[in-house]
Amino acid sequence: MIRLSKRSVSTLLRSGNQSFRIAAAASTSRSSPSATDVKRSDTESRWYSSLTNGQSKNSGSFAQLNMKTNWFMGYRNESSAAASDSSSQAPPPAEKFEYQAEVSRLMDLIVNSLYSNKEVFLRELISNASDALDKLRYLSVTNPELSKDAPDLDIRIYADKENGIITLTDSGIGMTRQELVDCLGTIAQSGTAKFMKALKDSKDAGGDNNLIGQFGVGFYSAFLVADRVIVSTKSPKSDKQYVWEGEANSSSFTIQEDTDPQSLIPRGTRITLHLKQEAKNFADPERIQKLVKNYSQFVSFPIYTWQEKGYTKEVEVEDDPTETKKDDQDDQTEKKKKTKKVVERYWDWELTNETQPIWLRNPKEVTTAEYNEFYRKAFNEYLDPLASSHFTTEGEVEFRSILYVPPVSPSGKDDIVNQKTKNIRLYVKRVFISDDFDGELFPRYLSFVKGVVDSHDLPLNVSREILQESRIVRIMKKRLVRKAFDMILGISLSENREDYEKFWDNFGKHLKLGCIEDRENHKRIAPLLRFFSSQSENDMISLDEYVENMKPEQKAIYFIASDSITSAKNAPFLEKMLEKGLEVLYLVEPIDEVAVQSLKAYKEKDFVDISKEDLDLGDKNEEKEAAVKKEFGQTCDWIKKRLGDKVASVQISNRLSSSPCVLVSGKFGWSANMERLMKAQSTGDTISLDYMKGRRVFEINPDHSIIKNINAAYNSNPNDEDAMRAIDLMYDAALVSSGFTPDNPAELGGKIYEMMDVALSGKWSSPEVQPQQQQMAHSHDAETFEAEVVEPVEVDGKK
């Protein structure tokens, strides 16, 4: 006998129990288990019920293991036998049911819930007609007899405005009676999808095709505008023509053979739409033409619409019988007949679409004039674009595209957050899908880029109106963005500098928004940025030009943000930098500061705001700093005590040369410019404003005479009231000159007037008059004088 440890027995029990469950499941899955199987399952069930629940009285008597069947064998546990007999019956077999649908309700959902725009019915029907023509063209390669009855492959649309009827006819492959039942009688069954699958399975299938359909619901979009649809079709595979007829609110349709000689067609399909009362405006020939040009302009086959035309001709004008004849007229002179021009009207078929899109041509064969003409026509523009890019991408995603940079911003220079634009027209197999995107193909900061994108395989929803989010779309977006940047970079590198100046004037703010929102493309955006600087106040420079002009010892790119170039160049922060010849960028647009801070660095050079603390100009002299700190250190503490919580600290400045003091922002706080902007946009939340502006550093210039006098005042009489007032006024002056807004402008004005009074006292007045004026001023405060009336006296003393 083999002895097993407790752990081994436990493992074997679990293994056996699992095997039993598998076996039991297999036995119950059979529809009619045999009696032997039921008996064996019953026995095994009782054994493992006893083993796993610890109910066996003879726990030591079943140590045998049958290795062949992986079952424990031993004594039968009689106490559980009765219970297992009652539960050994196999469950009854499950019945299988098919889903049922209320067809009329389902049709209503498909028609009215899938499509958001009724206009797409024509796009869907034209796409189906194009697929029918494509099928015929493919099959005719191996069987030329299919196309002998009607050699012309085209689509014709007739609009009867008076009766509200639209008829669309194609000379495609047509349908047999059975195909009518399968394709039009079965919802969501796509004959085109089946055909494409057959092409892929065929050894003779070509690599590329223009077949459009895939969902099998496009035909039913006809019920968006029609309450009755009649389909007459003739397949070259059959000698008979059949008519399919259905109504919008019906759950059934009819099919019958068409025996009317006048309605027979050589081959193809004719769809007749009897429009609803509210949709009869679609039967206007001009509107049909407009819809074709919008949605199906580049379908592979010619589309003709029935249009009214006219030509001008001259006709004779009959003489007026009331006109008197001239008696003296020479009878021999031949009279000249009077004519007038009239327009002769007639109806005829007119080609409405262009079958060869420009983006399918080789870019080397397309001229600039053709690109510009397509841009003006496609986007209804009258100016030529600044640049264009025609490209094809292959690999995981294959698509063709032409992108344009418009010459001006259509929505205004300041509108940079308009997410939804109609600047990108998406086509799938030449059929227009949509131009209403919300960042799917381009980020909003590049929403000004216009163009067309055509792909053969994109994840669309069933209505083919919405581009679904997927990895393919993300890859496409990334490649489109890169091509757009390449196109803009080409403008910036052009010899014609005015082109990029025009671009920057219209779309510079868009790129700055990209610095904030698109960190992934910082390296592409940064070379395109332009700013004014301390060495270029009239012409903007690029960051590359700034880096080239940097001093050898310069380690950072310096900038200052302000509301104008004038205020930026006169700020006290620039004094020492201008002396050293260090260039400073002027950020004068509200978005500039945030954009540059988002970049953080360019070509391993950090951006440094010169209006913030801890400015390092690379000229530290520790011995000199120690001497100055020793001399003015206590004065700084004295000034800090006077200013209190207004400043975080008072320090010796290394950025001043002509100003006595300056107020700088904390390293992680808002600058004066940012604080001004945030106050303008504040909606009453002052807590965050106070928090971000809380840390300010008051820097003093030890070489300035005012600071030297303040230092002397501290050393002689630190409690002098005039010195205290001077510190307060010095702080307020620094507040204004540094770009901050004083909390109490009136109080600041009072301090200035007071100091002016002290400074101007005795400046122009005589010493004798001054005490008298002061005495009169004091007496005026004590009492009120009555006015003395003085009579006028002439020069000679007479009244």
From Swiss-Prot:
Residues 784-799 have a biased composition (Acidic residues). GO terms for cellular component: chloroplast stroma; cytosol; mitochondrion; plant-type cell wall. ATP binds at residues 124, 128, 170, 175, 190-191, 214-219, 269, 464. InterPro entries: HATPase_C_sf, Heat_shock_protein_90_CS, HSP90_C, Hsp90_fam, Hsp90_N, Ribosomal_Su5_D2-typ_SF. Residues 1-48 form a transit peptide. Its main location: mitochondrion. Residues 23-35 have a biased composition (Low complexity). Gene3D superfamilies: 3.30.230.80, 3.40.50.11260, Heat shock protein 90, C-terminal domain (1.20.120.790), Histidine kinase-like ATPase, C-terminal domain (3.30.565.10). Keywords: ATP-binding, Chaperone, Mitochondrion, Nucleotide-binding, Stress response, Transit peptide. Residues 23-61, 314-337, 766-799 are annotated as: Disordered. Residues 322-334 have a biased composition (Basic and acidic residues). Disulfide bonds: none annotated. It is found in: Mitochondrion. Residues 46-61, 766-777 have a biased composition (Polar residues). NCBIfam families: PRK05218.1. HAMAP family: HSP90. Molecular chaperone which stabilizes unfolding protein intermediates and functions as a folding molecular chaperone that assists the non-covalent folding of proteins in an ATP-dependent manner. Belongs to the heat shock protein 90 family. This is Heat shock protein 90-6, mitochondrial. It comes from Arabidopsis thaliana (Mouse-ear cress). The gene is HSP90-6.
